[in-house]
Amino acid sequence: MAKKVVGEIKLQIPAGKANPSPPVGPALGQRGVNIMEFCKAFNERTKDMGSFNIPVIITVYQDKSFTFITKKPPVTDLIKKASGVEKGSDNPLKNKIAKLTHKQVEEIAQLKMEDLNTSTMEAAKKIVMGSARSMGVEVVD
């Protein structure tokens, strides 16, 4: 018989840097999950993913065991890395802070394809370009 799911927790944790301090500790502690066991497993799985924030979905079962799924880094983090900026523009309509090429947009869309709710590359590129536009990053040829 399958284990009974008692909760699902969604977090964004820096790759390879999960520790029991907030937000990880309190989120897992209130569900009764072994926090250090999760931290070790997460850090092991994400140690080669650079310094990105990694979205993770943790499924907690009735017997206090858990499974987790890691996703690709957020599109905004990938855009910031590709364009070399620290954060998005405070006024994206007036202040363009960086430029991305269509090739860079395609690389980001390719990387995020499995996490996006689309099946075509064109739609994925539009999603990435929309995120870039809202950050004040201009897409050029």
Curated annotation (Swiss-Prot):
This is Large ribosomal subunit protein uL11. InterPro entries: Ribosomal_uL11, Ribosomal_uL11_bac-typ, Ribosomal_uL11_C, Ribosomal_uL11_C_sf, Ribosomal_uL11_CS, Ribosomal_uL11_N, Ribosomal_uL11_N_sf. Part of the ribosomal stalk of the 50S ribosomal subunit. Interacts with L10 and the large rRNA to form the base of the stalk. L10 forms an elongated spine to which L12 dimers bind in a sequential fashion forming a multimeric L10(L12)X complex. Keywords: Methylation, Ribonucleoprotein, Ribosomal protein, RNA-binding, rRNA-binding. One of its GO terms (cellular component) is cytosolic large ribosomal subunit. It comes from Helicobacter pylori (strain G27). Forms part of the ribosomal stalk which helps the ribosome interact with GTP-bound translation factors. SUPFAM superfamilies: Ribosomal L11/L12e N-terminal domain, Ribosomal protein L11, C-terminal domain. PANTHER family: 60S RIBOSOMAL PROTEIN L12, LARGE RIBOSOMAL SUBUNIT PROTEIN UL11M. One of its GO terms (molecular function) is large ribosomal subunit rRNA binding. It holds the Pfam family Ribosomal_L11_N.
